[in-house]
Curated annotation (Swiss-Prot):
Domain UvrD-like helicase C-terminal, residue spans: 279-590
Cofactor: Mg(2+); [4Fe-4S] cluster
Residues bound to ATP: 8-15
NCBIfam families: addB_Gpos (TIGR02773)
Cofactor binding description: Binds 1 [4Fe-4S] cluster.
Annotated gene: addB
Name of this chain's protein: ATP-dependent helicase/deoxyribonuclease subunit B
Length: 1157
């Protein structure tokens, strides 16, 4: 037994010396005693591959490349101790959560933090650290007692006592039941000398800068058992003797060396003469890299003149541009310099911040890459299936979890069937017992509030299909729900969850996905599909082992599983042999790399400045060390250890190293380069500096550098063609690139990509045959549809031509409320008529009583009983009742003060309507029939005939402007008036005269007051003012007084003000009889003109802008039309409020010319 040190700086050939010694043994004696190479866990695959690639060595059985943990497993399996079930990290965290909950009231410090997210993980790491540093509960309790005796550290003593209690509890829980993985190395140290496999073997220990107390115990046992233990130390041999400063680069290694010497002395293990590897010729072929290795941490240091070959500093605009630059450089190295992808490594201080960018960008460049990090699984469909199934049964079958479950592609339904079911459930607000009661669904979304006429044939077929899909979708989930909710403990809950997955044949589906991914060359995805099932079953095993007999609420169990899945990571090995390796600086132990890219060399990132302190602060760690309890280094010590990571970064490659840094983060915030950059410039004054632009830029980089993989080059080509199209000069190289694509296999793809350069987002006219098929002849149109056409022809085409609709959602929106108010006021009016009452004679009590009856009758009919579905919506029913009561009161007040009485309520016109449809002859000679529904027509007799006024109910504030009528945006009131006047004799028996077109606002407004609450009459008067109708009124005092008999000054009812001399004030919205006639004539022209354009195929994307309003604001079709002001051809039609006199002049001229004849 003996120990030999192999000492040398980075690049001196320590790993090579270990591998060569093992290779020599394997070639000399293939069947001799075992040879063990101990390396960090993350390096096992790379080192084993390097060993297997030995020329002349077709295979080996003697050599073992192991980590400490894997060595423990092998030895315990040999000598005993591996049979007892082990509790994994996830299981231990679950146990700790339970123990924390039970002990919370007794814990002085940790109890206050026990409910904080992630605290159980922090606690588990701290207890693991205690085990690693061989500190048990007795030592913790003793240290707490000593600190209290000395005084001044009460908080630290409380922490130690809390940890001691939890440590005792954890050990009691695990005793005789489980093996804690944190105890593996202690168990290994205790029984290593019993192992026949290790006894007499030679061991090499490589790649470690330091060891934990547990690992020191294992090394001592190895030294006693093996024939020789070779330990490599990465340090300058001179640093291992004499005094050395704590801030020195090799101080941590010196501490390790001193401790190993002390261990050998205590164990009486002989020390062999160390193997000192001097010089840098073993690895570095670049003098510049060799100079950095030797002098980077030496001050003062001589600069290396004219020897910067192999070192590049690169700045990029942001991390994306940086990743693009790295991809281009890698392509150039492999294409022009004969590198293989496996010769290249990308080193990162924080892999997570770059992993996504590198994956997507390298795929575009066609560069195979392996990112050395354990993959989270939360994105995987199987994990989503588990989480959503648990969430569905614990959250009363809410919409989101149920359909997340169904959309995993692991439930036996097609996506089309899931979509159909989703639309139905969204439309009817189905959740809870309506999923589980077994009764067939027969909900329908009613478009009216009339009596239910029953199911028609197509509705019956659709409901039958929906119910069939529902049964197929929920059969397994219902069975899981039943067994899960009846489970008596965690074991039975886990069994129910496992049965759900096996019932759905999830393992078989994952295997199928894995095979398919492998066929498509997606090797990492294939491996991930294979591992996720074993990872999940291992998690379930740990849950059962740790909490099997515990009784948890369903929500608590779901939280345990969710936490376990969130911390579950899949460790993948490189699926290919020729890939770029992406690794963390802390995990990088890769031999023989020719080129290294160190990304993210920014201030505060490399070297890092902030560290997770865990439960103990740096000061507390120092106090514990003084008290004899040594823990892992604190933040201060870690900051010095960052120097060693910088040293690793600078010395990983033999030929080339690229240090790159973004100048801003992804959100544009400025970033500074790391001090490393300035230091490299000091040592290498001639170092090559580059700027990696986002797009080709000849001033910064040769355009040829951007010609990489076909996919990425094509996107660069598109950007250059855009520059050329804009009139700017581009490098002739891009025409050669274009020719290559145009003549090759990717010409169709190239054509599609470049077609976007000429995209104008314009719509051509529809061919006559298409227009005929969509709209038919005669054209049937509604007034609101023609208004929509004037607002935007394309929106009209989508809505009335293609009949696109937003999918129905179970919610109470403005159209629903509008339908409700219209139906309520019609029913109210019908009851007034049926009971022989006059609107003007209705008192407050009658209005309130009748309105309440009407609302109670209609509420269950609205959108599948939506008003009865929740307490909030039932409260809303009361608000609707008050609003309808207020509308009835205001209408009654109108009747008391006017001579106008209703002659039509919710009166329809058009085919099958109450009144015939107005028919217009269009430009091509065909006809258009216009339909609509008039909310309320009122009439008042006069000497000249019968005045008619149109009232349109609105739940919001609406006004009428002549500009809107002129541009065809608001035609409904005039169209309704025109229809009423055309059929006045049918409605009234007399000659119809235009009286007014008005909007009636349905609301129950609040009255603001600065002082005491005013009397009731004053409040009612203020409410009347707030609900004053808007619109246009005949400029005839007689007609006006028929609408407001007591009018004196400003009317509370209509938009009119009469001055003292009897004339109308300027603020009055009045029109003469001639103006009404002119507008009626213009209305017919507008409707016929719009109809002619529709059948002529006009579908242009032409929304309008008026002031701050854009017609796109409330349009549901924006994702379809993709209107964008930045795209050629997309511009708003600007509509301005013109002077009314100017508009009347235009209308007069148009009328005299025959409306455009």
């Amino acid at each position: 037994m003996s120990i030999r040190f192999i000492i040398g700086r980075a690049g001196a050939g320590k790993t090579r010396a270990c591998l060569e010694a093992i290779r020599k043994e394997l070639l000399a004696r293939p069947y001799g005693p075992p040879l063990i190479l101990l390396v960090p866990e993350q390096a096992t695959f790379q080192i084993e591959y390097a060993l297997a690639a030995t020329p002349g060595l077709s295979g080996f059985i003697r050599a073992r490349v192991l980590s400490f943990r894997r060595l423990a497993y092998r030895v315990l399996r040999e000598v005993g101790g591996a049979a007892r079930a082990h509790i994994g990290e996830l299981g231990k965290r679950m146990v700790l959560r339970r123990l924390l909950e039970q002990r919370r009231s007794e814990l002085r410090v940790l109890g206050r933090s026990s409910g904080r997210p992630g605290f159980a993980d922090t606690l588990a790491r701290t207890l693991g650290e205690m085990k690693t540093y061989c500190i048990g509960p007795d030592e913790l309790a003793r240290a707490a007692f000593d600190l209290r005796e000395k005084g001044g550290a009460a908080l630290l003593a409380d922490k130690l006592e809390d940890l001691a209690k939890l440590c005792f509890d954890l050990e009691d829980y695990l005793a005789g039941r489980f093996t804690d993985p944190d105890d593996y190395l202690n168990l290994l140290a205790d029984c290593l000398e019993l192992s026949a496999e290790v006894r007499g073997t030679e061991v090499w220990v490589d790649g470690f800068s330091g060891f934990t107390p547990q690992e020191y115990r294992v090394l001592a046992a190895l030294a006693r058992t093996a024939s020789r233990v070779n330990i490599t130390l990465c340090a300058d041999p001179a640093a291992l003797s004499g005094k050395i400063d704590e801030t020195s680069l090799f101080f941590p290694v010196r501490e390790t060396y001193d401790r190993l010497l002390k261990m050998a002395l205590q164990e009486r293990i002989p020390l062999e003469r160390p193997l000192i590897l001097g010089g840098n010729t073993a690895r570095f072929k670049s003098p510049a890299i060799s100079h950095l290795e030797k002098y980077f941490f030496v001050r003062p240091a001589p600069p290396c003149l004219n020897c910067s070959e192999g070192v590049v500093l690169a700045a990029a605009a942001n991390p994306k541009a940086e990743a693009e630059g790295v991809a281009r450089e890698i392509t150039a190295l492999c294409r022009d310099r004969g590198y293989r992808y496996r010769d290249i490594v990308i080193l990162l201080r924080d892999v997570d911040s770059y992993a996504g960018l590198i994956s997507s960008i390298f795929a575009d460049h066609g560069i195979p890459v392996f990112i050395d990090q354990k993959r989270p699984v939360m994105h995987h469909p199987m994990v989503e299936l588990v989480r959503s199934a648990l969430e569905a049964v614990t959250e009363d079958w809410a919409f989101d979890p149920v359909f997340r479950y169904l959309k995993t592609d692991l439930v036996p339904l097609s996506r089309e069937e899931v979509d159909l079911l989703e639309n139905y459930v969204l439309a009817h607000g189905i959740r809870g017992s309506r999923w589980t009661d077994g009764r067939p669904w027969e909900y329908r979304r009613e478009l009216t509030l009339e009596e239910d006429p029953g199911l028609n044939g197509s509705e019956s077929v659709e409901l039958e299909k929906v119910n069939r899909i529902r049964h197929q979708a929920t059969a397994d989930l219902l069975e899981f729900c039943r067994s899960f909710m009846q489970a008596k403990n965690v074991r039975e809950m886990s069994t129910a969850l496992f049965n759900l997955l096996t019932g759905l044949k999830v393992p078989e589906q994952l295997e199928s996905w894995s095979r398919q991914a492998e066929k498509e060359g997606r090797l990492e995805a294939a491996r991930e599909h294979s591992l996720v099932w074993s990872g999940f079953t291992a998690l379930l095993d740990q849950v059962v082992e740790a909490l099997g007999d515990e009784v948890l609420e369903p929500g608590e169990y779901a939280a345990v599983i969710d936490a376990g899945l969130e911390s579950l990571r899949l460790g993948l090995i490189p699926p290919g042999l020729d890939q770029v390796l992406v690794a963390s600086l802390e995990r990088s132990r890769n031999p023989e790399m020719r080129a290294a890219f160190v990304m993210g060399v920014n201030d505060g990132v490399l070297p890092a400045r902030t560290f997770d302190q865990g439960i103990f602060s740096d000061l507390e760690r120092e106090r514990l060390k003084a008290a004899g309890l040594e823990l892992a280094p604190g933040g201060r010590r870690k900051f010095f250890e960052e120097q060693y990571l910088v040293y690793i970064a600078l010395t990983r490659s033999s030929e080339r190293i690229y240090l790159s840094y973004p100048l801003a983060d992804g959100e544009g915030r400025a970033l500074m380069p790391s001090p490393i950059v300035a230091r490299v410039k000091e040592l290498l004054p001639d170092v090559e500096e580059r700027v990696w632009p986002v797009e080709p830029n000849a001033a910064l980089l040769d355009d040829l550098e951007f010609v990489t993989g076909p996919r990425r080059t094509l996107s660069y080509l598109a950007s250059q063609m855009r520059e050329f199209k804009a009139g700017r000069r581009i490098d002739p190289l891009w025409w050669d690139v274009y020719s290559w694509f145009a003549a090759g296999e990717m010409r169709e793809h190239c054509k599609r990509v470049l077609s976007g350069l000429f995209h104008s987002n314009r719509e051509d006219r529809l061919p006559p045959a298409v227009s005929m098929a969509l709209y038919g002849r005669p054209l049937r149109a509604s007034v609101s549809g023609l208004e929509k056409f004037r607002a935007c022809p394309f929106a009209h085409f989508l809505s009335y031509g293609l009949k696109l609709k937003e999918r129905a959602i179970f919610k109470l929106d403005a159209p629903d409320l509008g339908r409700f108010f219209h139906a309520a006021l019609k029913l109210f009016g019908d009851r007034v008529r049926e009971q022989g009452l006059d609107w003007g004679q209705l008192d407050r009590e009658q209005c309130q009583e009748m309105a309440g009856e009407v609302v109670d009758l209609l509420a269950p009919r609205l959108s599948s009983e939506i008003l009865l579905s929740t307490a909030r919506r039932r409260y809303l029913t009361g608000k609707l009742r008050r609003t309808v009561q207020r509308a009835a009161l205001v209408l009654a007040e109108h009747s008391r003060r006017s001579k106008f009485r209703p002659v039509g309520l919710e009166l329809s016109f058009g085919p099958d309507g109450d009144l015939p449809a107005p028919v217009f002859t269009l430009a091509d000679g065909s006809e258009m029939a216009v339909s609509g529904r008039i909310d309320r027509i009122e009439a008042a007799p006069s000497d000249e005939g019968v005045y008619l006024r149109i009232i349109d109910f609105k739940s919001g504030k609406v006004t009428v402007k002549l500009t809107d009528i002129y541009h065809g945006l608001k035609l409904q009131l005039l169209a309704y008036l025109d229809v009423a006047l055309e059929h006045a004799r049918t409605l009234t028996g007399g000659n119809g005269l235009p009286g007014a077109v008005l909007y009636f606002r349905i609301d129950d407004p609040l009255v603001n007051t600065d002082g005491p609450v005013p009397p009731g009459e004053e409040v009612e008067r203020e409410i009347l003012k707030k609900l004053r109708m808007t619109g246009l009124v005949l400029a005839d005092p007689k007609a006006v007084r028929l609408m407001d008999a007591g009018l004196d000054g400003i009317s509370d009812l209509i938009p009119v003000q009469i001055k003292a001399d009897g004339s109308f004030a300027a603020r009055s919205a009045v029109l003469t009889r001639e103006q009404f006639a002119l507008l009626r004539s213009y209305l017919r022209f507008q409707l016929a003109s719009a109809g002619s354009e529709i059948i002529g195929g006009t579908v242009e994307i032409a929304p309008y802008r008026k002031g701050r309003y854009r017609s796109c604001q409330s349009c549901p079709f924006r994702p379809v039309c993709q209107f964008d002001l930045l795209v050629d051809g997309n511009v708003y039609r600007s509509i301005k409020d013109e002077d009314e006199g100017a508009i009347w002049s235009k209308l007069g001229r148009m009328c005299r010319k025959g409306w455009g004849q």
